[in-house]
């Protein structure tokens, strides 16, 4: 093994309290690796040594997205957090989507987009997290992370339907 690093410690009295799972996909945004886990942290990791450059306390089962300025995380309570990519300091927080069972975020043309359990896509400003709009995908509860390509946003429902949306 070349290296390994832990994003959080398994603390607590019961087995449930000790859960510290990686449920989200890693992201690579040159030259760093970004990771977030449940009951742990979000971190920027040096890929040559496995050493965290910075980390911040946040718990996520959904995931994260990265752009030049920010690391965006959907937490376990459906709050969307932006951390400055340069130093991990909080940039903004969007708390207006609680109880929506949000997907991991995706960044598209200066917007942060998350899907929810009712099939809505919520659009936020990447600059300050303010709500910009909301679209109904038409496919039902959104599963997984929306993906983008050539100006289109693609989402998949829990029932297997796929929709394409131009933002």
Listing of model-derived features with the role each one plays in the protein:
Residues 40, 78-79, 118-120, 160:
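Short coil/turn segments within WD40 beta-propeller repeats
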């Amino acid at each position: 093994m070349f290296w390994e690093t832990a994003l959080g410690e398994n603390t607590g009295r019961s087995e449930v309290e000790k859960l510290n799972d990686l449920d989200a996909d890693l992201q690579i945004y040159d030259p760093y690796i970004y990771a977030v886990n449940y009951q742990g942290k979000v971190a920027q990791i040096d890929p040559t040594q496995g050493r965290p450059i910075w980390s911040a306390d946040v718990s996520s089962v959904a995931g994260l997205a990265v752009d030049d300025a920010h690391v965006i995380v959907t937490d376990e309570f459906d709050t969307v957090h932006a951390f400055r990519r340069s130093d991990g300091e909080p940039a903004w927080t969007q708390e207006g989507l609680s109880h929506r069972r949000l997907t991991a975020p995706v960044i598209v043309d200066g917007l942060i987009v998350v899907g929810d359990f009712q099939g809505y896509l919520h659009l936020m400003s990447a600059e300050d997290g303010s709500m910009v709009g909301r679209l109904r995908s038409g496919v039902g509860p959104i599963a997984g992370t929306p993906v983008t390509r050539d100006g289109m946003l693609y989402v998949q429902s829990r029932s297997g339907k796929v929709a394409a949306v131009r933002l």
